[in-house]
């Protein structure tokens, strides 16, 4: 086991215990997206349904030496049609997961959020990075760094709840510790994120957010480092040992996630929640292990939802 990726390796091994889930891959028309889907299938994580221009997908596979003969292809003329086809498969119950291929995130999300034909639910849609940071002994969830640009307090309630629900799937034996981040750990009327952090914590106390332990505002250092929390004399079950970092806005979250990736050798698996099915958002810069981990996370979420639905009707 590669110690740098040991947390991802454990997730992938756990996922292999389940049946592979049908996954609609939207426009896998370059090597990285097609190879990621094929290798995830070879590891037993997903059963890909390739949505895109048939001839173009076949050419990429031939050029890269990838065998896609056993995978279904849903022919779609262009990237917009590929996104719509993948979403349609999810709506029809033929796919339990949707994966982004070589199209722009906005193209896929436009199909996802369509009020008539998309995958909306009563929840706010949000994104979670599931990060394997070598310096930490646990997987770290960062939200929201990709979908909600300037979320309101109301938006953040769903963002936090989506992240807690994800953490409980990944670690059912551990109550998630949620740090609501700001630039400081005291409430300052001049810094709106500190007021929202305090409000979210009170909402959790009142049962408006469930399943996790919340604390905030917390600065990044005293959210993830026990020594920093002790120096600041912050006494809470979250400080220094957060599993989830809730950022004030997309800009802060994106910079935090990319800083960990490019300066701390972390890998970032990405998943969108608050939709009918989990959606894997990958980047062309993602490593293969990050792509596989994204598939594993989405597969575990899909399996948990399937088990919950079965329990509800039994």
Task: Give, region by region, the residue ranges found by the protein language model.
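Anion-binding alpha/beta catalytic cores of soluble intermediary-metabolism enzymes, centered on
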Residues: 1-49, 53-238, 243-314
């Amino acid at each position: 086991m590669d110690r740098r990726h040991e947390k991802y390796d454990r997730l992938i091994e756990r996922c292999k215990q389940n049946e592979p889930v049908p996954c609609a891959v939207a426009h896998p028309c370059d090597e990285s997206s097609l190879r990621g889907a094929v290798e995830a299938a070879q590891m037993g994580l997903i059963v890909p349904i390739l949505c895109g221009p048939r001839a173009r997908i076949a050419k990429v596979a031939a050029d890269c030496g990838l065998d896609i003969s056993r995978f279904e292809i849903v022919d779609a003329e262009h990237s917009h049609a590929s996104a719509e086809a993948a979403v349609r498969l999810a709506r029809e119950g033929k796919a339990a997961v949707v994966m982004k291929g070589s199209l722009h995130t906005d193209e896929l999300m436009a199909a996802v959020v369509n009020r008539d034909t998309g995958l909306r639910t009563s929840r706010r849609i949000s994104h979670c990075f599931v990060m394997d940071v070598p310096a930490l002994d646990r997987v770290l969830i960062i939200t929201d760094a990709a979908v909600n640009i300037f979320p309101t307090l109301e938006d953040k309630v769903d963002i936090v709840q989506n992240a807690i629900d994800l953490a409980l799937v990944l670690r059912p034996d551990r109550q998630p510790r949620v740090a609501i981040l700001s630039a400081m750990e005291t409430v300052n009327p001049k810094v709106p994120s500190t007021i929202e952090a305090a409000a979210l914590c009170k909402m959790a106390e009142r049962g408006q957010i469930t399943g996790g332990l919340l604390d905030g505002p917390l600065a990044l250092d005293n959210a993830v480092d026990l020594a920093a929390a002790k120096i600041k004399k912050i006494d809470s079950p979250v400080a220094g040992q957060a599993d989830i970092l809730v950022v004030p806005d997309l800009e802060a979250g994106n910079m935090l996630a990319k800083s960990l990736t490019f300066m701390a050798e972390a890998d970032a698996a990405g998943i969108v929640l608050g939709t009918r099915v989990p959606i894997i958002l990958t980047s062309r810069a993602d490593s293969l292990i990050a792509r596989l981990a994204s598939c594993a996370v989405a597969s575990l979420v899909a399996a948990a939802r399937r088990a919950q639905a079965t329990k509800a009707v039994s």
